[in-house]
Amino acid sequence: MITLLSTWTFGLALALVALGVFVSYRLFSFPDITTDGSFTLGAVVAAVLLTAGCDPILATLGGMAAGGLAGCTTALLHAFFGVERLLAGILVTTALASVNLVVLGRSNVPLSGTTTLLDQAEAGIGPVFERTGLSSALAGEAARLAFVLGVVGLAIALLWTFFRTQLGTAMRAGGDTPTMARALGRNTGGMTLAGLAIANGLTALSGALVAQYQGFADVQMGIGMVVWGMASVFLGAALVGPVRLGGGLVATAAGSVTFRLLVAAALRAGLDPDWLKAATAVVVLAALVAPRFLTRGSHARTH
């Protein structure tokens, strides 16, 4: 039972990465490779602040802000210096590999002896679950799950609210049709900057939470996060089909949890962990290709 709850918690923490990819890719049509670097940056900054005795909330927000700055850098390279989108993300991610190592000071920093947000959640919410008859270990994991679920729910609510405002709607329109937005006098560069700041801030928040959940930060922990995010977005879309903004956000989070459950099941079935990244790529490919075959099949049946 603890393993299942842990899988849910980890999947929800990574759902913030998926939401970031949803914002950059779905809403702004921006294939942002910065995700890998900003995830690690959020974890690294939060870990350094925590080990320095900083308040867990401030440390987590600091990691989130650092990720937002990374997204701004990618947007600046593209929108104001004319660097192609993929190349801008690659350049920033490459630079962040050095930045993360310098900030962390070494390749891995344990968080033992520090008080994290999840420790506080366990201390505050855990007794509530214990009163239902759960063991202390199970109640602690349930408390961590409830906390991360609350963070993801709040993120979805804030994104849904913001992108339905006049400014948010204009940003979405600029992402869909930038040429028309420029013709209407919209500052598409500023919109891209804000969008990538939000996307990478969410990704860095995920990194900060994952580091606190795992109990350490590592300079390699962000490798493959952009693929995880894409897999979650496409898997969520495959699960629910075409939906509006709110449904898309919820489906993306559900896709992350579902994907984490699939990964856990595959590992328990004997999948070599060395093949995990390759399996992730296959899932993304399947989610991309399957709808086309289903569409062809439906057309064939109707003709």
Model-identified regions with their sequence ranges:
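Membrane-interfacial amphipathic/re-entrant helices at transmembrane-helix boundaries
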Residues: 1-18, 25, 45, 53-59, ...
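Transmembrane alpha-helical segments in multi-pass inner-membrane proteins
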Residues: 200-278
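Single transmembrane alpha-helix segments in multi-pass membrane proteins
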Residues: 3-61, 76-82, 234-246, 266, ...
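Transmembrane helix-bundle core of multi-pass membrane transporters
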Residues: 85, 89-92, 96-164, 194, ...
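Loop-to-transmembrane alpha-helix initiation sites
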Residues: 10, 85-87, 112, 144-148, ...
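Helix-loop-helix "hairpin" substructures at the membrane interface of multi-pass membrane proteins
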Residues: 55, 70, 140-218
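Alpha-helical transmembrane segments within multi-pass membrane transporters and channels
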Residues: 21, 54-99, 153, 254-255, ...
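Cytosolic-side transmembrane-helix boundaries in multi-pass membrane proteins
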Residues: 158, 176-190, 243-247, 262-303
